[in-house]
Amino acid sequence: MLPIETLAAPPELARSEPAWRLAAASFLIPGRLQREHGQRRLGTTAKWVAVAGWVLIAASAAGLLLAPVAVLTIALSPAGAPVIALTLGLFAAWWFVLGVHTAIVARRVSVSVKAASVAALVMVTVGALLLSSAPPAAATVTVLAARSAAAGFFTDAATPETWQGRWNIALLGGDADVDRDGQRIDSITVLSVDVDTGASLLISLPRGLQQIPLTDDSPLRSIWRSGVYDCGHACQLGFLYPYGEESWAELYAGEIPPGSSAGVEALRDGLEGLLELPVHGSVVIDYPGLAAVVDALGGVVVDVRERLPIGGDENQVGVAGWIEPGEQRLSGVEAAWFARSRMSTSEADRMERQQVLLTELLTQVNPAELALHTGTIADAVRSDLPTGMLPVLLRAADEVGSHGLEMLSFGDIDLEHPDVAAIRASVGDALGE
């Protein structure tokens, strides 16, 4: 317990400084009142605790500027977040108690004061508490919330082995509709990240691609014994997801990792068979989720090449507004329709816009901003990425923000009879194989 004594203030302080001013001054110079009222040890302790706090704040700020990936990796890790939160919590508790003690000393009363004096004391105490304990308490909540969100985004699955020093992640854009049950996949992209440098390649594939080779161990080979997912127009790459969700859950029973689903696993089998590279994880986000993320990040700047509708159908019925050509900072809803609009544009055009939007999001957002909005991101997406991928993904975000990323798009290929060998060769060349 901190010592609380009935103390007389020095005459000059009693005459010239009201209690609230003394309490405020003690926030700037912790322990001042205690030292001036004979409690030198407590006052000195308060001063050095404050110095330690400011040093930690300065070191954290410098770390975020000079080595953001390392700092955020520690702050969001299962081991680091509790330690940081505990430290901040102890600071908050210390400042809370010190604020009460300072207010009591400033009022020159003892713990046995009358009720009327307590009422007068409350206002000073509240001011001290708000000024002193609220920031570290809020920081504690922020760290715990960010870690909780990161835990919701990442899974506890084992970190996968790299493939040629890379991790490959399927980024899937969902398109739910009130007139249609379930969700279909509207955009399919594979992000390939070098685990050492963070250098990234974005591979964009058309959802309507047909004649997809399957992996050797795919459960779908029990249906397509030739090893090729092929039944004409009804067997498109993007259809693997809804088919898996609605019809093939039993085929994938026992093979679905945490955070994934039968639809994601079916699409993973198609991507791995087509590209001949392993897909180590997936992220699924629908258009409302995309809009929420873009809004949380303050919008995204893109170069709009043609006038695009917001809402409406192919006949411009129900259009709520327009996205005009030129460089625009798009809101969440505008960004979703920039990627989604089908009016007067081809599938290749849509793929290009989706790739542009994703690229701009990745290049305009730094790791610190991503960490601040982990809650929104975790609520908007579904992911099966293991926690062990976090440091590499933060490094990739930092690298992309500084140097951009490479892009490979297959928007203009033959959808019905794709040249699979040519697709694989292009991917291999882009990856430097």
Model-found features: residue ranges?
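N-terminal secretory targeting signals
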Residues: M1-E5, L28, R32, A59, ...
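Membrane-interface helix-boundary signature
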Residues: Q39-L42, A46, T73-T87, S112-A115
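Internal/C-terminal transmembrane anchor helices
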Residues: S110-T142
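Non-catalytic, solvent-exposed segments at the cell envelope interface
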Residues: P136-E433
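Membrane-embedded alpha-helical segments of integral membrane proteins
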Residues: A52-A106
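Hydrophobic, aromatic-rich membrane-embedded alpha-helical segments
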Residues: R15-W54
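Cytoplasmic membrane-interface segments at the C-terminal ends of transmembrane helices
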Residues: L33-L42, W95-S117
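Actinobacteria-biased recognition of intrinsically disordered, low-complexity terminal regions
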Residues: M1-S16
